């Protein structure tokens, strides 16, 4: 039977922070313990529960650009529902290890995340997703959150401009979660490995991770451009 959890990400961080103030409660329940650390632009935490281990690192690599690395090492079937009220944001997601199913609330849409594909998405308004993974899965997930203003500055093109690679893929007026699957290329796989194995600390670490996240965004946008060019050049029957 799945261990169902329903919470907001901010609630989870509060719960982890509070748990550090009551270590005696954790001593009474050794199967459930946690650690939490906030340092500079990086927040990391780790939670041990009968369902398994769950860890997260979130880094603000620059204004408008967030990198997170999530890991699940599951002992039981697991279902996690996350509900958020979100400002407009583009997301790039890569399941580096393991696999899991994501369902989008309010629609029949769902997708399976695994190392062969990445996902480009656009979020705004009420966003509710449910992630399901089976016992025994060891999932590693790398996610990028990009403010539309930063993406516009990086590409020197508004997202609704005809030449922008995301124009026509996502609706700026539709609320919820829109997404599109993208093949993970060898170049993307190398950049992901370098993010996970970052050898630096402090300011050097932040600059290095910023360069790798921007590289991933560039590779994804290039693939979108190539896909659109291929569609436009295909003969109509």
Identify the residue ranges that each predicted region occupies.
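Short Lys/Arg-enriched alpha/beta "domain-start" segment
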Residues: 1-44
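N-terminal functional module of multi-domain proteins
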Residues: 30-140
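Alpha-helical bundle regulatory/interaction domains
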Residues: 4-10, 20, 100-237
């Amino acid at each position: 039977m799945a261990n169902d959890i329903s919470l907001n990400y901010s609630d989870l961080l509060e719960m982890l922070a509070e748990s550090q103030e009551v270590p005696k409660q954790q001593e009474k329940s050794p199967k459930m313990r946690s650690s939490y650390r906030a340092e500079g632009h990086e927040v990391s935490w780790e939670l041990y529960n009968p369902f398994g281990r769950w860890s997260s690192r979130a880094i603000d690599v620059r204004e408008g650009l967030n990198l997170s690395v999530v890991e699940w090492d599951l002992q039981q079937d697991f279902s996690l529902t996350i509900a958020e009220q979100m400002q407009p944001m583009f997301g790039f997601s890569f399941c580096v290890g393991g696999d899991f199913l994501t369902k989008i609330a309010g629609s029949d849409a769902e997708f399976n995340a695994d190392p062969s594909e990445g996902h480009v998405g656009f979020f705004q308004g009420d966003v509710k997703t449910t992630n399901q993974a089976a016992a025994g899965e060891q999932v590693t997930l790398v996610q990028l959150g990009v403010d539309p203003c930063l993406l516009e500055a990086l590409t020197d093109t508004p997202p609704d401009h005809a030449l922008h690679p995301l124009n026509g893929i996502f609706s700026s007026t539709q609320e919820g979660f829109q997404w599109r699957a993208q093949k993970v290329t060898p170049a993307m796989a190398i950049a992901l490995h370098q993010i996970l194995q970052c050898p630096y600390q402090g300011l050097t670490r932040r600059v290095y991770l910023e360069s790798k996240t921007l590289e991933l965004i560039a590779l994804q946008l290039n693939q979108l451009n190539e896909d659109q060019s291929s569609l436009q050049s295909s003969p109509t029957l």
